[in-house]
Amino acid sequence: MAQRFDRIWQNARLATLGEGRPGLGVIEHGVVASRAGRIAFAGPQSDFAADADAPERIDCEGRWITPGLIDCHTHLVYGGDRAHEFELRLAGASYEEIARAGGGIVSTVAATRAASEAELIASALPRLDALLAEGVTTIEIKSGYGLETATELRQLSAARALGEQRPVSVRTSFLGAHALPVEAGGDKERYIDLVCNEMLPAVAQSGAADAVDAFMETIAFSPEQTSRVFAAAKTLGLPVKLHADQLSNLGGAALAAGFGALSADHLEHTDEVGAVAMARSGTVAVLLPGAYYFIRETQKPPVELFRKHGVKLALATDCNPGSSPLTSLLLTMNMAATLFRMTVDECIAGVTREGARALGLLADTGTLEPGKWCNLAIWDIGRPAELVYRLGFNPLHQRVWRGR
């Protein structure tokens, strides 16, 4: 009896990203077939059943297929913008100076608190659409611009709604420990009490978040305060991830690893102790070259240390209004290659397989393997390096989410 599939993509070149394959896991003469939204076959044409049948067959005409792209660190939902702060930075003000003067995250908090859920969704949709237009099929979206329970929940609800309005998988992270709100009067301990005793239980009860994040930095929260948040999250059964070592080395990478974090992100100032700890815990390093570029950082993340110790490397846009108003994973890959000296294979893996790993989703997406969601990006390119090499050019031919 002939094998039945829903759709078959044939005459394609595949970059499977399978972990058991070298490099990008390339198959020159490949086929992908889907059934019930998942990959039922991904491999050489020669291994595909000659009598296979499907209502729809797509001739890819030699185009490349990669897994759908994954943006594993964004702050996509927020109110207002911070273009005026961009002008201040151009005039010489630093990110820290703007934050300490009441700008930065806190200014976005005011605009986000004033916005309705519908307004938050409407403002985020164009940013999401820009990412989808480049082949993104999975995105992580954080809260963190409410800094009080109602607005944090509203942000998370808006993020979930985006996944209902567009064909994309949305993962949400609660980032209540992002900054200190004005009404806290400088009392970080009391605010962390609020995060742990009120916000986190409300978030967990509502099911609004898939993970808990925090910003551990001299201008944000201490290692001790971050540990309190993570301990509370773990008690509630929520995995954690951390904005770590971006502006200074407070031991964020090692702290994240100690809590078994899915990922530690930024990492410009991480040392070898942190890299070793991440390797042991399986914590993914999420590098954010857009933020490095936009705020004109000079300390690069220690990519060689991560390679040396086998830490997995993911990439993301860090789309946010203050330090990375970026909605292009293609440009993110180019930045990672040119600024951080990452290889083409590392960059492409970083926005597919390793992005999935950073979200705890590798069992379901991130590679072209049977059983995973049929999330594909089909490209008009001659070789995968073009995805990293080109600037301001989008070679996406088709984006497929769950087989459609």
UniProtKB/Swiss-Prot annotation:
Cofactor: Zn(2+); Fe(3+)
Pfam family, one: Amidohydro_1
Enzyme class name: hydrolase
Binding site for 4-imidazolone-5-propanoate: 82, 145, 178, 246, 323
Subcellular locations according to the entry: Cytoplasm
Assigned EC number: 3.5.2.7
Binding, N-formimidoyl-L-glutamate: 145, 320, 322
Binding-site residues, Zn(2+): 73, 75, 243, 318
Pathway per the UniProt entry: Amino-acid degradation; L-histidine degradation into L-glutamate; N-formimidoyl-L-glutamate from L-histidine: step 3/3
Gene Ontology BP annotations: L-histidine catabolic process to glutamate and formamide; L-histidine catabolic process to glutamate and formate
GO MF annotation terms: imidazolonepropionase activity; iron ion binding; zinc ion binding
Chief place where the protein resides: cytoplasm
GO cellular component labels: cytoplasm
Binding of Fe(3+), residues: 73, 75, 243, 318
Free-text remark on how the cofactor is bound: Binds 1 zinc or iron ion per subunit.
UniProt-listed HAMAP family: HutI
NCBIfam families: hutI
Function: Catalyzes the hydrolytic cleavage of the carbon-nitrogen bond in imidazolone-5-propanoate to yield N-formimidoyl-L-glutamate. It is the third step in the universal histidine degradation pathway.
Protein name, per record: Imidazolonepropionase
